Amino acid sequence: MNATMQRSAVAGRTSGKVATTARASSMARPRLPIAGRVARRSAVTVRAVAEPVVVDKAVEAPAKPVPSGGDPWEDEKWTKYKWTVYRGVAYDLTPYLDRHPGGRWLLNLAIGRDATALFESYHLRPEVAASMLKRLPVLADFPVDAVPPSPRPNDSELYNAIRERVRKEVFKGTEIKGAHRSGSEGAAFAVLGYAAAMYALYTYDANPLTGALLGLGGAWIGLTIQHCGNHGAMSTNPVVNNLMGLTNDLAGGSSLMWRYHHQVSHHIHCNDDALDEDVFSAFPMLRFDDRLPKAWYHQFQHVYMWALFPFLQLVFQIGDWQALLTNRTVGATLYGASNFERQTLIAGKLAHYFLLYGLPAFLHGPTAMLGGAAGYLFTQSIVLAATFAVSHNVPETKPLDPGPTRENLDESAVTRDWGVQQVLTSANWGGVIGNFFTGGLNLQIEHHLFPAISFMHYPAISKIVADECKQRGIPYSHYDTLPEILGRFVRYMKEVGAAPQKPVKRDGEMLMLSKF
């Protein structure tokens, strides 16, 4: 993700600000009537796809008799349900929310949207998840055509082949018992131990140095345990995953906003200029993509971005509060967010402010606190910005010239090959050591294909992914070290800052962004 300015106050939390681009301007348009949405949907080009994963037949619950038509987000006949759409069928999730093995907080992400890609990319055995879904009440006459459609990972021949080999060669059947969600416990203890020790040092003597050391701990939390926990990949116990995810709040972020921004928007639509908020949320300050309009100052962004990166943490704060008030991150609406989750956000913010500002000010005075807090904010921000930004912002993942990556992204989000998209739009660097310190974010390709698998398994999975891509002639991007990919990122930012705007070549639009 472009964590660099993901919730920029300058770029704006509202869709109107993003409307400076032709693609994102859809977010500011009035909501289309149902008939209009259907007409837009019909313009999508259809292409042949791989045979989807076979799902065992399950006994389906009788459809609920409800009136036809209506707006599923506003009409009472639909809003009383916790509805989701999977492969063209609407289901009521209410009976299953508290029984979901991954926890209700994860299933909430599916409410109010087509969650096909979420379901299929989060389950190593998607046939089991689909079978359970088919036991839920079906909402008859639900206006499915009014819901922005989701990509379908199971229709990707590449993704199916990789997943099958991962199940057989890496987990050998143990995924049935949840082995794929474990293995990172040692890393969690290391991260928490370091963060606790640095906080003790910070409260003992608050100054820029101890603040910077604590900032490294905050960044390490952001890269590893909160990230893995919010994906439900730290443990087979959803409570553990939730607690690890909440460390994001203590470190200064928001686990709730992260899940919608990162998992609903970025992961499903990686590097899509209209649907991945990491592409456009820093605009107009930073231009991460040549499909965005070009301003004169973008030619210098590879220089001045380093003056912006230290303020990423402050951007998080502004963006999280704005999203809470507007019920929307830049790229995803909080349809399923519960009142408890919202209250947790507020409590987490207050706890963070007390730990970083309140207690040190009480112990050492405001001057010492400000110096220490500045060290924390700047260090955490720079580490997160630099580490996250390189994964999707190099020439291989966002080429300025024609090629397979641009061809894939020029298709509509619904019809493009989802598995191929994740490979083409992500880049890896380093190996096992980088995997430990970044929570698997250095192996970004594997993380995007399997977000719900513990990062400790990514090195083994990467060999399978590289082999399957080689067999099909699909580019697989890997840099040897972080400095190497970081240097290429800087050069890319210079190149894209000077590049002319490229039109988006898509045959038709498939959704109203304001309802995504």
Curated annotation (Swiss-Prot):
Catalytically driven reaction(s): a (7Z,10Z,13Z,16Z,19Z)-docosapentaenoyl-containing glycerolipid + 2 Fe(II)-[cytochrome b5] + O2 + 2 H(+) = a (4Z,7Z,10Z,13Z,16Z,19Z)-docosahexaenoyl-containing glycerolipid + 2 Fe(III)-[cytochrome b5] + 2 H2O; a (7Z,10Z,13Z,16Z)-docosatetraenoyl-containing glycerolipid + 2 Fe(II)-[cytochrome b5] + O2 + 2 H(+) = a (4Z,7Z,10Z,13Z,16Z)-docosapentaenoyl-containing glycerolipid + 2 Fe(III)-[cytochrome b5] + 2 H2O
Localization of this protein: Plastid, Chloroplast membrane
Cleaved signal peptide residues: none
Protein name: Acyl-lipid (7-3)-desaturase, chloroplastic
Lineage: Eukaryota, Viridiplantae, Chlorophyta, core chlorophytes, Chlorophyceae
Record's keyword annotation contains Ion transport: no
Binding positions for heme per the UniProt entry: H100, H123
Topology term for the membrane: Multi-pass membrane protein
PANTHER family: DELTA(5) FATTY ACID DESATURASE C-RELATED, FATTY ACID DESATURASE 2
Superkingdom to which the source organism belongs: Eukaryota
Motif range (Histidine box-1): 227-231
Function statement: Fatty acid desaturase that introduces a cis double bond at the 4-position in 16-carbon polyunsaturated fatty acids that contain a Delta(7) double bond, resulting in the production of 16 carbon fatty acid (7Z,10Z,13Z)-hexadeca-7,10,13-trienoate.
Organism: Chlamydomonas reinhardtii
Cofactor: Fe(2+)
